[in-house]
Regions:
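Helix C-cap/helix->beta junction micro-motif
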Residues: 27, 67, 105-109
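N-terminal Rossmann NAD(P)H-binding glycine-rich loop of SDR-like oxidoreductase domains
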Residues: 3-26
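NAD(P)-cofactor binding segment of oxidoreductase domains
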Residues: 72, 86-114
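A generic structural motif
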Residues: 26-32
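SDR active-site strand-loop-helix element
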Residues: 9, 34, 75-76, 113-118, ...
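NAD(P)H-binding glycine-rich loop region in Rossmannoid oxidoreductase-like domains
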Residues: 51-94
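Active-site "gating" loop of Rossmann-like NAD(P)-dependent oxidoreductase/epimerase domains
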Residues: 78-81, 86, 119-130
Length: 130
């Protein structure tokens, strides 16, 4: 039986790193992690790591073609509320537009998509959707 291919996006973050480490210990999975920056723990597990910008549509499409994941776990985000409040365009690009594109890539490739988010609701005092 072929090993399930799992792609963990945001693998350098707190949650993503723990998920990547746990999944990479299970040899029935072929685990790949990706993040904007180089792997912070390059010798910590049995996984492949690819540096990728989730806001770059072409790079994400190439990643999906290369990995052909069965399951995608997205833990990436701009998650500091004060920063997001003052950097709307960047927050929207990472937390909305990139996630929409991830969902499209998953749909096109037949991958299951698990998206982890936050319980924070931003704003409420502006006319912008939240």
């Amino acid at each position: 039986m072929a090993r399930k291919k799992i792609l963990v996006i945001g693998a350098n973050g707190f949650t993503g790193r723990r998920i990547l480490d746990d999944l990479s210990r299970n040899l029935s999975y072929q685990t790949t992690g990706c993040s904007l920056h180089d792997d912070i723990c390059p010798h910590s597990g049995n996984y492949r790591f690819i540096r990728t910008d989730i806001c770059n549509r072409q790079a994400m499409e190439k990643l999906f073609q290369e990995v052909q994941p069965d399951v995608v776990i997205n833990t990436s985000a701009l998650s500091v509320p004060d920063y997001c409040e003052t950097h709307h365009a960047e927050a929207d690009a990472v937390n909305i537009t990139a996630v929409e594109h991830l969902a499209e890539c998953c749909e096109a490739g037949g991958s299951r998509f698990i998206h982890l988010s936050t319980d924070f609701v931003f704003g409420g005092d502006t006319d912008r959707p939240y």
